């Protein structure tokens, strides 16, 4: 059975430093598990690891998404699982590092893996609810009686 290592803790607790030390000892690569560090262009506000922090160790799923494109915990967990397999296929140890409890739960226990809400549709449904909640409920029951 192939294994991976997970480091979870609060902000500024030394997770990144520890993950790099362990990656060097275990011949590993680091996968981010942070709900904000996924976004590009906000590295300072999210404490994304710098090149210096990474110290030559490959890091994955940091700063890869535009902030205008939300990501669900389920979608993120799917990406992490893919990275784990890729790293293990290369004979290395995946080290999952971060502090996002919901993302960790999605990874270990499962969660809806669909994309985030369709915001225009959500807006229309919210307006329909405000206009006539009973009519919306009846409409929903016609689609899904349960």
Please place each PLM-identified region on the residue numbering:
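Phosphate/pyrophosphate-binding catalytic cores of soluble transferases and nucleic-acid-acting enzymes
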Residues: 1-146
């Amino acid at each position: 059975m192939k294994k991976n290592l997970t480091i979870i803790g609060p902000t500024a607790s030394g997770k990144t430093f520890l993950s790099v030390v362990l990656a060097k000892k275990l011949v590993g690569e680091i996968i981010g598990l942070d709900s904000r560090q996924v976004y590009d262009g906000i590295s300072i506000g999210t404490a994304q690891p710098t090149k210096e922090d990474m110290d030559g160790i490959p890091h994955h799923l940091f700063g890869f998404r535009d902030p205008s494109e939300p990501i669900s915990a389920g979608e993120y967990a799917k990406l992490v699982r893919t990275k784990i397999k890729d790293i293990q296929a290369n004979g290395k140890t995946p080290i999952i590092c971060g502090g996002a409890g919901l993302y960790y739960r999605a990874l270990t226990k499962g969660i809806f893996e669909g994309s985030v809400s369709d915001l225009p549709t959500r807006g229309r449904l919210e307006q329909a609810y405000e206009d006539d909640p009973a009519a919306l409920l009846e409409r929903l029951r016609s689609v899904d009686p349960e």
